[in-house]
């Protein structure tokens, strides 16, 4: 990074924080547009605001994003939700969900990302068949409990533990009902969204996995990327 590595590191961290704020603001705007500007009546917006506050996103940034999504602030830019899919290195199926104010920028950027990592961006549906559309809920709960029993009682299909947080998978149509059931059972829900779950996992060697993870991290760091899904 050169002789100014300390300064450069600070600049890089600031840039990364700015990128995170931009992505969070887009999700807030999209959520407000889809379900209205009242977080008490819009669970997606409420969770997006909570996520933004968790990383100290400025309040004025949050308020502007809500107004923009609700149509109360016109800056001449419209945020669209777009999905790109294709094959990454070693034949791994990849779906990238984007939020962008310029699809003419995002599409070529995505195409370049796939190509530069020995992948190939395909047409709509080219790898979607490798995934199941599901509801994904993440949350935590105090005290002792049986995760499997919690999942059954709430109507979820599966539950997985991930460093103190639990992921519940549901049928896509059951997302809201399961989220409400978990909340009523004392869960603090930190994420509730439609997602993609790989039907089958692509077998990889350790070296191949490094290639794929490098590609997925690259995608995740792109300005317009919202979520990345892969068959690993």
From Swiss-Prot:
Subcellular location as annotated: Cytoplasm
A Gene Ontology molecular function term of the record: DNA binding
GO cellular component, one term: cytoplasm
InterPro entries: Integrase-like_N, TACO1_YebC-like_2nd/3rd_dom, TACO1_YebC_N, Transcrip_reg_TACO1-like, Transcrip_reg_TACO1-like_dom3, YebC-like
UniProt keyword annotation of Manganese present: no
Annotated Pfam families: TACO1_YebC_N, Transcrip_reg
Any Gene Ontology biological process: regulation of DNA-templated transcription
Keyword terms, alphabetized: Cytoplasm, DNA-binding, Transcription, Transcription regulation
Protein family: Belongs to the TACO1 family.
PANTHER family linked: TRANSLATIONAL ACTIVATOR OF CYTOCHROME C OXIDASE 1 (PTHR12532:SF0)
The protein's name in its UniProt record: Probable transcriptional regulatory protein Bd1964
